[in-house]
């Protein structure tokens, strides 16, 4: 009995350690926009100057009343709704802002959120890190995107010789080839949990192997951008938070200082893949920088070529293609909203397991005891390329093929950064609300 108590005491002490992955997983659970409260933070200071968007008078904000087509999934119907109607019906909305020509056309906050509320933007941070890489490239700290990662982190040569063939451009495009699963399940023993909640990011990187050759295929994972953040720090000799402050937060006239999570106080490696904490208006200023191809009121912060590449539709990864360019997403699949009926739930689950390209928003029982699924991302497939081109009158950006047939990828000029909890920074240099 005494021995049991001794062992239990050791376990309890370990669980109480703040850097313990298991402790954090149990205490904080799944990802939350307030996760920054669980981690040590470094401040991304803003300067004394402020840039402020103009605000359209409330009487002129036509987007408040404009309706657009939106599916009402419970009945499988298409209906017209205002933006307010759509956003108020969703769960856990926080904030939404639409800016056009430096003027706020629409702005809403929900619940306890307001104009000053800051939250963790998760993987939108990846696009911010890409931007910071572009700044370092523009300033000559990074010589070329074809540079090997080991030029900046030489100790990785001893971890795995494949790191010598890993280039910065592979990190930007998610084609690093790392054997790392982006698993958000509440599992404190997963690689993702160890990276996100652990206290030594470099150890995770050094112990990770490669599943395939760098540049070969697109495979999204946060460890890739974690490495990119370290490359930027090594190249500049400046901590991530300080460099982001000097080159972006101060020049862009941010309203508030931001913060970035770090692995722990000893190693101080920034969570460059998910840890930035800011507000929507300041995040919109990053969008403005890209809309102006890296120029901020006459100052070229980012090289315009780097921005153009980031905002250029292209497929990355030879074997598994991704709609991802310099850590920005582009393009959309042509999708159909439809309903599919099944005899039972098991049949439904088996179908979607075999057809991973089809997603559903909702499912419900019908009066006969079967199931109906509302599909919202069912790609419009064609048996051959000719049929596809005829359907779209040859107006298609890219044609791809899977085992289900040929499908189109359209590009309307928009690009976006995306976070796991639905955070989106969308920019479109070609979009005009009024002609």
Report residues per predicted region.
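Short, small/polar residue-rich loop motifs at catalytic or cofactor-binding pockets
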Residues: 90-93, 117, 419-421
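Penicillin-binding protein/beta-lactamase superfamily catalytic region
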Residues: 242, 257-399, 404-427
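N-terminal leader/targeting segments and the immediately adjacent pre-domain N-terminus
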Residues: 4-6, 20-113, 142, 341, ...
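Active-site helix/loop module of the DD-peptidase/beta-lactamase fold
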Residues: 139-178, 207-209, 236-273, 278, ...
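Active-site SXXK
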Residues: 102, 120-145, 171, 228-232, ...
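Short, acidic, Ser/Thr-enriched surface-loop or helix-capping motifs
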Residues: 99, 428-429
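Bacterial N-terminal signal peptides
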Residues: 9-18
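Active-site-proximal loop and beta-strand segments within enzyme catalytic domains
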Residues: 76-78, 84-86, 114-121, 125, ...
């Amino acid at each position: 009995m005494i021995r049991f108590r001794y062992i239990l005491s050791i376990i309890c002490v370990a669980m109480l350690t703040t850097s313990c992955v298991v402790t954090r997983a149990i205490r904080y659970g799944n990802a939350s926009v307030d996760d920054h409260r669980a981690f040590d933070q470094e401040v991304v200071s803003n300067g004394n100057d402020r840039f402020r968007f103009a605000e359209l008078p409330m009487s002129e904000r036509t987007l408040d009343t404009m309706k657009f087509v939106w599916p009402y999934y419970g009945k499988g119907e298409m209906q017209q709704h205002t933006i307010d109607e759509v956003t108020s019906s969703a769960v856990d909305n926080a904030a939404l802002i639409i800016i056009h020509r430096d003027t706020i056309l629409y702005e809403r906050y929900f619940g306890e959120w307001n104009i000053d509320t800051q939250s963790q933007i998760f993987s939108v941070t990846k696009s911010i890190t890409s931007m910071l890489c572009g700044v370092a490239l523009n300033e000559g700290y990074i010589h070329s995107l074809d540079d090997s990662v080991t030029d900046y982190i030489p100790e990785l040569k001893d971890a795995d010789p494949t790191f010598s063939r890993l280039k910065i451009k592979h990190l930007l495009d998610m084609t690093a080839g790392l054997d790392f699963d982006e698993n958000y399940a509440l599992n404190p023993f997963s690689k993702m949990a160890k990276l996100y909640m652990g206290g030594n990011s470099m150890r995770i990187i050094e112990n990770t192997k490669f599943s395939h050759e760098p540049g070969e295929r697109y495979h999204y994972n946060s460890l890739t951008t974690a490495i990119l953040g370290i490359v930027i720090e090594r190249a500049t000799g400046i901590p991530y938070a300080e460099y982001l402050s000097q080159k972006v937060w101060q020049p862009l006239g941010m309203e508030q200082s931001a913060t970035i999570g770090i692995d722990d106080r000893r190693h101080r490696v920034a969570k460059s893949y998910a840890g930035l904490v800011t507000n929507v208006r300041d995040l919109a200023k990053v969008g403005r920088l890209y809309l102006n191809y890296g120029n901020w009121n006459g100052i070229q912060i980012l090289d315009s070529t780097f921005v153009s590449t980031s905002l250029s539709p292209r497929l990355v990864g030879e074997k598994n293609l991704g709609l991802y360019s310099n850590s920005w997403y582009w393009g959309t699949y042509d999708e159909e909203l439809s309903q599919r009926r099944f005899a039972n739930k098991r049949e439904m689950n088996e179908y979607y397991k075999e057809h991973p390209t089809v997603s559903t928003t909702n499912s419900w029982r019908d009066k006969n005891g079967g199931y109906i699924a509302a599909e919202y991302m069912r790609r419009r497939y064609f048996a051959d390329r000719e049929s596809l081109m005829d359907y779209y009158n040859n107006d298609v950006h890219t044609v791809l093929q899977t085992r289900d047939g040929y499908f189109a990828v359209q590009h309307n000029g928009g690009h976006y950064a995306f976070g796991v909890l639905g955070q989106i920074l969308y920019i479109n240099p070609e979009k005009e609300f009024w002609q």
